[in-house]
């Protein structure tokens, strides 16, 4: 196959573009599952945040913004799936193409940023329980969240004013990750948004685990399970994002070495990149697990709902008037998830005394 078979000029840059039929066969089912489970999980999380939380704390504000970012990313997946199903033939026009790519990039980056903020918040609450950052007001947390959203939009807004749709034979290509002989801002952000948060998450997770072991808390079986959860969060982040980043770096190396003189050498890495890129959306699908274990509100809510259903079934009693939202304020009589006890704000009712009383 000659260079011209896959060669395409995009915005004045020489690029290699592929329309691999394997993408149309493999990725739509994967994205479909991510969409369904991600929509259910994040939609339920937002519903609980909006209608069943009676009190707000800074940590919950950060979790809420994480849920918003994940939800906005997930709702873009049907359009991306349609693009893959039609073998890289975008059918919705130039402006929708820009909006979709912007939403995917902005909310992927926003999701990573707020997941990192949650990790930092847990770090200060467990390792430095008396630090002034643990006492920031809801207003300050909201201002920080607005600043982070502004930063995220500023780093990805170029996708809105750049023409992202290119005629490719009989099809219209809509992609922000074509293989072009130039290192773009978008590529730099794709790498930075992984390595910097990864370093922060690993540092925070490691310090939390080390701090608990120094206090000899890790001998407790329940704390061991909580520590395992912290490690799982970091591992899932790596599994979701590292493969696509590694393949992208490989593409940069090939471009540095061979330019785009022969597009055939990029065929396999192009397929590998878009396959692994679909794994990054899995992180947004799995983030509701973080919400569940990071706040007593979620396990309390589900426990209350299950207890009500069981009570109705077994006793046939009418539902009482006690509001579910009261349960979410942290009723001390409610048994919480043990991993949540470690990850939650020590000042919340229901948090274990060995976290709240630590003064080191």
From Swiss-Prot:
Membrane topology: Multi-pass membrane protein
Subcellular location as annotated: Cell membrane
Effect of inactivating the gene: Niacin administration has no effect on serum adiponectin levels in contrast to wild-type mice where levels are decreased.
Family annotation (InterPro entries): GPCR_Rhodpsn, GPCR_Rhodpsn_7TM, HCARs
Induction: By interferon-gamma in macrophages.
Main location class: membrane
GO CC aspect terms: membrane; plasma membrane
CDD domains: 7tmA_HCAR1-3
Stated name of the protein: Hydroxycarboxylic acid receptor 2
Species assigned in the record: Mus musculus
Gene behind the chain: Hcar2
